[in-house]
Design a protein with these regions (language model features):
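N-terminal export signals
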Residues: 5-24
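Active-site acidic/histidine proton-transfer and metal-coordination neighborhood
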Residues: 11, 81, 85, 100-193, ...
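C-terminal segment of N-terminal export signals and the immediately downstream linker at the start
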Residues: 21-51
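Conserved, mostly hydrophobic/aromatic
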Residues: 32, 52, 60, 82, ...
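Acidic-and-aromatic substrate-binding clefts and catalytic sites of carbohydrate-active enzymes
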Residues: 37-43, 63-74, 96-107, 132-141, ...
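Short, acidic/polar
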Residues: 40-51, 105-116, 207-211
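Catalytic domains of carbohydrate-active enzymes, especially glycoside hydrolases
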Residues: 48-63, 120-121
Length: 287
């Protein structure tokens, strides 16, 4: 499906959706994926969080966890910085290659992660990426099994495991279904949710609303990332691209949406201006 068809189908879907969703969405806080301001994080985590709070965001989705540290800071230190800026961290992206790929993985490492995530008051531990060398049908099957195992342990911490898509998950697996569809069907719905990156779904020619309808309640997290006009399809400020956000947010109840995170990877102006424009558009035109 090309972008014009995607936009057209979304517009048709809007007519079929009730206005009930717009009342529902006003309950949501506005979050941001911290990776959006990664260059500022590299300069100063403190400054990055201050800039996010100043722009009006309520919570951040963390990234950068390694050896029990975020950018050289402990979970307790990050928690303190979040509190200083009146921010929450309901979710975090965690690159878990060892857990996903290592047949002899020591699950004690997972428990350390759960301890740190609990300290940060996470509700979700999100797996954001699979390496290109680990995307076969067998790889996805093993990853799905590991996600279920990890999620079973996370339940004791009142957390769920999530999986975040790019475009490759929409490729067909050996059984004729997409890898993402197989993952959704083969994970425990009581323990595992999915974070739909709206940009990557559109990039792959998918209609997000179709996925919400096929798997209601499973996409509790979203990445709200817009796609610029033109052939490069780069990300841009929310509201400046081709994605119909009003239509998508009207379907949030079907999706099961709990939290969404603004994200942007390419900039044509200073990043804090970008995130201010995005939240301004959402507050004025969508929420």
């Amino acid at each position: 499906m090309n972008r014009r068809a995607f936009i057209g189908q979304s517009a048709l879907a809007a007519a079929a959706l009730s206005m009930q969703g717009f009342a529902f969405q006003k309950q949501h806080q506005i979050g941001i994926q911290l990776y959006t301001v990664r260059d500022e994080v590299a300069k100063s985590v403190e400054g990055a969080l201050q800039g996010i709070a100043k722009a009006g965001y309520d919570h951040v989705e963390l990234y950068g966890y390694q050896d029990r540290l975020f950018f050289g800071k402990t979970a307790a230190q990050i928690k303190a910085l979040l509190k200083q800026n009146k921010l929450q961290a309901h979710s975090g992206h965690y690159l878990l290659q060892d857990m996903l790929y290592n047949k002899t993985y020591n699950w004690d490492s997972w428990k350390y992660l759960l301890d740190d995530a609990a300290l940060l008051q996470h509700q979700y531990i999100v797996i954001p990426w699979l390496d290109a060398a680990h995307r076969t049908g067998d790889d996805f099957k093993r990853v799905t099994e590991r996600i279920n195992e990890g999620a079973a342990l996370a339940k004791a911490y009142k957390m769920k495991v999530g999986y975040h898509n790019h475009d490759f998950e929409f490729q067909k697996a050996g059984n004729g279904k997409t890898f993402l569809e197989n993952m959704i069907r083969d994970t425990d719905p009581g323990l595992v949710d999915f974070e739909l990156d709206i940009y990557w779904a559109a990039y792959a020619g998918q209609d997000p609303i179709d996925w919400f309808r096929r798997f209601p309640g499973r996409f509790t997290l979203w990445h709200v990332k817009d796609m610029s006009q033109g052939p490069n399809k780069q990300s841009c400020e929310v509201g400046k691209g081709v994605i119909d956000w009003k239509t998508i947010f009207a379907a949030q109840k079907t999706s099961g949406l709990k939290y969404f995170f603004v994200e942007q990877e390419h900039y044509t102006q200073p990043v804090f201006n970008c995130i201010a424009d995005s939240i301004g558009y959402l507050k004025k035109e969508v929420l």
